[in-house]
């Protein structure tokens, strides 16, 4: 194997050993020394925390108002039933939010196979036990909400945002969206021709059956690559600053004098002088206003007090008045 000492070996998929339908070993080699742990740890974290999937998020059980209760004829208490529902492995095509229904009566176990669903839904573990009915007259009916997400979202993280609209009897469930149940990696020595200082990465994972192990590795690698894209080009790329255009005048000056809520006498006097906007008013002096017919010192004092309450006064000098927007009107 000839090449520059600065060149890095690129790993390739060597083997996928399917131990069972939900358990597989994936081997990647060769890797430069140290890259086995670097990539193995990164992929492990992504596979555990960031893989998308579907999970039960809410449940409504007929006759049950809260999770700290029991139901007649059901062997398990409601908390245990909710815990069992978390173990459902569901694949959903084309939808992010669905409602499944379950109706069962008579003595015996209630399993995932008893759930009613349409063709867009596949329950991977139909033999998964949800609860047991202990009486021939016992029955259970529930509506199960399944949503798409990623990682782990506890019910406590959603209870405050949904509490106002959530009816009594709708029980929130801790949602574990990740289809990967367990993952571990091991790094062994590898050899390529004369080089013996290389790594072999062995990733062993168990899933809930809703995702193929090879596809899981591919998705995790894609997520990692997308996150690292920002470091590929470290040029200082700055977002263009959006300069906020400051209004030419204080917005209050563009409001009509009607907003000052003056007395009828004062308002009519200003209207007679064609003073329509507050800006027209503040540019007048006390002497000019006192020349207005029927506007005495009492009205002048009222106008000054109202303007002062808004941080304005008479005799202000404003340039470029009136603005084009008003002049055009």
From Swiss-Prot:
CDD domains: RNAP_alpha_NTD. One of its GO terms (molecular function) is DNA-directed RNA polymerase activity. SUPFAM superfamilies: C-terminal domain of RNA polymerase alpha subunit, Insert subdomain of RNA polymerase alpha subunit, RBP11-like subunits of RNA polymerase. Residues 249-329 are annotated as: Alpha C-terminal domain (alpha-CTD). Residues 1-235 are annotated as: Alpha N-terminal domain (alpha-NTD). It comes from the Bacteria. GO terms for biological process: DNA-templated transcription. It catalyses: RNA(n) + a ribonucleoside 5'-triphosphate = RNA(n+1) + diphosphate. GO terms for cellular component: cytoplasm; DNA-directed RNA polymerase complex. Homodimer. The RNAP catalytic core consists of 2 alpha, 1 beta, 1 beta' and 1 omega subunit. When a sigma factor is associated with the core the holoenzyme is formed, which can initiate transcription. DNA-dependent RNA polymerase catalyzes the transcription of DNA into RNA using the four ribonucleoside triphosphates as substrates. The N-terminal domain is essential for RNAP assembly and basal transcription, whereas the C-terminal domain is involved in interaction with transcriptional regulators and with upstream promoter elements. This is DNA-directed RNA polymerase subunit alpha. It comes from Actinobacillus pleuropneumoniae serotype 5b (strain L20). The gene is rpoA.
